[in-house]
Amino acid sequence: MSRMVDTMGDLLTARRHFDRAMTIKNGQGCVAALPEFVAATEADPSMADAWLGRIACGDRDLASLKQLNAHSEWLHRETTRIGRTLAAEVQLGPSIGITVTDASQVGLALSSALTIAGEYAKADALLANRELLDSWRNYQWHQLARAFLMYVTQRWPDVLSTAAEDLPPQAIVMPAVTASICALAAHAAAHLGQGRVALDWLDRVDVIGHSRSSERFGADVLTAAIGPADIPLLVADLAYVRGMVYRQLHEEDKAQIWLSKATINGVLTDAAKEALADPNLRLIVTDERTIASRSDRWDASTAKSRDQLDDDNAAQRRGELLAEGRELLAKQVGLAAVKQAVSALEDQLEVRMMRLEHGLPVEGQTNHMLLVGPPGTGKTTTAEALGKIYAGMGIVRHPEIREVRRSDFCGHYIGESGPKTNELIEKSLGRIIFMDEFYSLIERHQDGTPDMIGMEAVNQLLVQLETHRFDFCFIGAGYEDQVDEFLTVNPGLAGRFNRKLRFESYSPVEIVEIGHRYATPRASQLDDAAREVFLDAVTTIRNYTTPSGQHGIDAMQNGRFARNVIERAEGFRDTRVVAQKRAGQPVSVQDLQIITATDIDAAIRSVCSDNRDMAAIVW
C-alpha cells in the first residue's frame, strides 16, 4: 500500500512538472521549459512525453533518446490528458532531421543516434524491428537510416544495395530524404571506384536554380529537387562529392569548379577546402573483397590488407599452383637435369621452411638463383614454372614472374640507379623477378670497365638480395660464361645466388619434338618425310660452328628455331595449297594441315638465311 502511494505521488509530482513545462514552453520557450521537463522525468522516469519534451527543448543526450524509446509505449498519455501535442526534431542521417511524435519515429531517430555514437550493432538490431514500419511515411526514413549506418561504417556495397531498394507503392516519398539517400549512394560508389555510377546518383538530385539533371531519368527512378538554402549541409555535400568524383575521373577542371561550390553560407566546408588545397587528394577506394574480409563487420580497420587477401587467395590455390608449376615444367621437351634440380630444390625449400618454423639456422640459403645456358633452351618457361612452384609452396605470394631489364634498375645519371633499384625491389617483395641477359645490367667501356650507373644498380641490388633473402626471388639468366664474368664485378655478388641451373642445347631429336608440339595445337602436322628432313637439317645445324665459335643450334636459338621453322613452313604450305586450288585440283582438310618435306626444307633454309652467322653452312 505504501509503495502504491509513493508511485502515485511520483506520478502526480511528475505531472505537475510536466504541465508547468508545457505552459512555460508555450509562453517563454524551450530553454525555460527544459528544467521542468527534467524534473518530470526525475520524478517518473517512465513518463515518455516528458522525455520527448526534454529532447524537443534541446536535450541531445543519447541516454535521453534511449529512455524515450524504452518508454515509448506511454507516448501521448500526458499530452492527451491536457489536450496538447508535442514533437521533437531529431537528426536522422548526416544532414536532415525527422519530426518525432510516435514510437516508431523514436526508434528510427534512435537508430541514427546510435550510428553517430558508434553503437553500430545496436543500430542494426533496432532497424531489423519491422514495427518501425508502421506507417507509409516511415519506409523512406528507414531506408535512409539503414543507408546511413552502412555509410558511417564504410560498408559501401550495402549503402548502394540499400539505396537501390524499391519502396512500396504506398510509401510517402520526401525530396529531402531522397536527396540524402542519393548523396550517400554517390559517396559509396565513389569509394568503390565507380565514378560514373556516383555521377548517376548525383544527377538524380536537382538543386533548384542550379541544375536540372534529373530530367534524363524515367518515372521509375526516384529523383528530387531541393532549394539551395533548404538544407545547406546537404547541398554542399552534393557539390563536394561531385567534385571528388570528377577528380577520380581525371577531370580536374570540373573538380575544381564543383569543390568551389561546396559552401555553407558562402564558406567552404573543411573537406572542400582541404581538397582544393591539394589536387592529389582523393577519396580512398576499396573493393567488396576487402570489406567482406573484416573480422568486425562494423570496423573498417579490421579489414585485411591487399597482401593479406592475396596470401589467403594463394593459400587456397597453393595445391593447384604447385601442380600447375610441376606440369608446366614436365611438359618441356628434354631438360632432364633441370627437372631433377628443381625437384631437389623443392625438397630443400620444404626442409628450410620446417627448420625456420623450429628456429633452426638456414645460413647461406636464399631464394635467388641463376639459370644459365644458350637462348631458347627453356629458361623463361622454367622461371614461369618456378613462379607457380614457389607460390604453391608459400615462398612467394604471387605466381606471376615479373620480367625486368637494365632500364628498370638504372637511371640516366649517377645517383639515380640506387633509389630506382630499391624502389623496384620494394615493389617486388612477394614476387619473382626474372632478368634474361642478367649481365646487361652493366655496360662496358672501351677498356672493359663497367659503367658507374650500372655498378650503382649492382651494388644496391647486392644489398637488397641479402636483406630480402626470403622475401622475394630474383632469377638471373643468360650465357654461363657471360654470367660468370658479370658476377666478378662485385666480390659479393656470386654469394647471393646459391643455386645455378644449367640448360644444355637441345638435341636434334628434341628440336623436332618441340616443332611437333608447337604445330599440333595450330592444327598443323608434319608428315614422316618432313620430320626426317627436319631431323637431318637440325643435325647439320647442330654440327655447324659459326665464325664466332658458337654452335649452330645456339646461334639459331634452339627452341625458338623450331617454332620459327613451323611458322615459316606453314607459309610455304599455304602458298602450295592455294596454287593447288587455282590449278583446279581439290583441296582436302588434310591438305590444309600437312607440312611436307618440301615445305620444311624451304622453311629451314629461309630461317637460317636470316642469320648471317649461318651463311657458310653446307646443306
From Swiss-Prot:
One Pfam family named in its UniProt record: AAA
Chief place where the protein resides: cytoplasm
MF-aspect GO terms: ATP binding; ATP hydrolysis activity
Amino acids binding ATP: G373, P374, P375, G376, T377, G378, K379, T380
Domain of life: Bacteria
UniProt subcellular location: Cytoplasm
Keyword list, A-Z: ATP-binding, Cytoplasm, Nucleotide-binding
SMART domains: AAA
Family under the similarity heading: Belongs to the CbxX/CfxQ family.
Subunit details: Part of the ESX-2 / type VII secretion system (T7SS), which is composed of cytosolic and membrane components. Residues 522-619 interact with an artificial EsxB-EsxA heterodimer from the adjacent ESX-1 locus.
NCBIfam families linked to this entry: T7SS_EccA
Function text: Shows ATPase activity. Could provide energy for export of ESX-2 substrates.
UniProt-recorded name of the protein: ESX-2 secretion system protein EccA2
